Every structure is written in C-alpha cells, then in structure tokens.
C-alpha cells in the first residue's frame, strides 16, 4: 500500500481513507422482476427455495452498498425487488435519455448525488440487424445476426445487463467530476 501523499490534485493514493464515490452495479439476477415467477414454492419446489435464498444473499449484497461508509453513492439495478424491500429508486432512466435508442428502465438509488441530467434524448426505437424495429416496446437479447436468443442462452444475461455508453459517460461526467472540481478550488 502506498502511504505517500500524491503531488497531483487529481489523484488519491490509497491511505486507508474512505471512498469518495461508489457507483455500484450489483448483479440483478435475483432482484429483477423478470424472474419473479420462479419464486413460487408450490410450483417450483426446491428450485424456488434456492432462488429465495439467492435473493436474500443478493439483497444483503445490495444493502452493503447502501450502508457503505461513503459520502456519495449510486446503486444501479433494473426495476425489481429492491423498490419494495428497500425503497423506491430516486430516479429511473433509460439509455435513450443519453443517446442510445434503447428503452431499458434502470433504477438509481442515490445518496448525496444529483439526478442524472439527460444528455441526448433520442427516439427509443430498437432496430435490429434484419432492419426490424420494435419501437422500444420490448427488449430481446439478440445475437450478432439479429436472431432472438433463448432466455437460458448464456449470452442473454450479458446482453441484457449491458450498461450503454451514453449512460456510462453521463455518470462519469456528472458525478465523477464533482470531487475533481471541488479539489481544484483549493488551488485558486
């Protein structure tokens, strides 16, 4: 561990101090509403009991971010269980607010952070390789040729959990720069 202070105002060495900002993207597998049918114990038995246990573990992990010793926290997850268990999200965004023409509701739970300001609102059409447009009504994971993937295809979870570049840029620009600018004022 480096214990020397940095000479650069934009860089902090690890000195066992607190985080400045946490932007968390905890796994949504057991927290999203899309898998709710699998929690029916009468119908799915042991599989449902295991999912209930997995959801409890996922909630515990999510809450570690909520309770982290950090001044500024953002937790991202789709519409799901945490809006009922914990509290409603502070903001619900879509990639089309930030230049990516996709409708995908994403919840943000915030601590001492402003709401993300949309940077480039576009029409939420989903156009696939075959030219078919769904006007953002539904979002299906598709392969590189535009073919809809089965729900249990290993690529589906990765594709559906994608963080779009416009959203990532907005997070970095709007939340990541706050500490930099506040530190720079020390040198004026």
Tell where the protein language model's regions lie, with residue ranges.
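Conserved active-site and SAM-binding loop architecture
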Residues: 1-188
């Amino acid at each position: 561990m480096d214990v020397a202070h940095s000479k650069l105002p934009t860089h902090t060495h690890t000195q066992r101090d607190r985080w400045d900002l946490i932007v968390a993207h905890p796994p949504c597998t057991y927290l999203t509403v899309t898998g709710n049918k699998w929690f029916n114990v009468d119908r799915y038995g042991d599989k449902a009991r295991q999912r209930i246990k997995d959801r409890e573990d996922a909630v515990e992990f999510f809450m570690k971010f909520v309770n982290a010793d950090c001044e500024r926290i953002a937790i991202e997850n789709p519409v799901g269980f945490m809006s009922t268990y914990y509290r409603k999200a502070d903001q619900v965004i879509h990639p089309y607010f930030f230049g990516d023409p996709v409708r995908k509701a994403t919840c943000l739970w915030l601590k001492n952070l402003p709401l993300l300001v949309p940077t480039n609102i576009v029409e939420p059409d989903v156009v696939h390789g075959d030219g078919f447009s769904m006007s953002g009504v539904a979002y299906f994971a598709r392969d590189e040729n535009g073919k809809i993937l089965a729900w249990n295809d290993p690529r589906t979870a990765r594709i559906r959990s994608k963080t779009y570049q416009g959203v990532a840029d907005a997070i970095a620009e709007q939340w990541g720069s706050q500490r930099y600018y506040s530190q720079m004022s020390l040198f004026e």
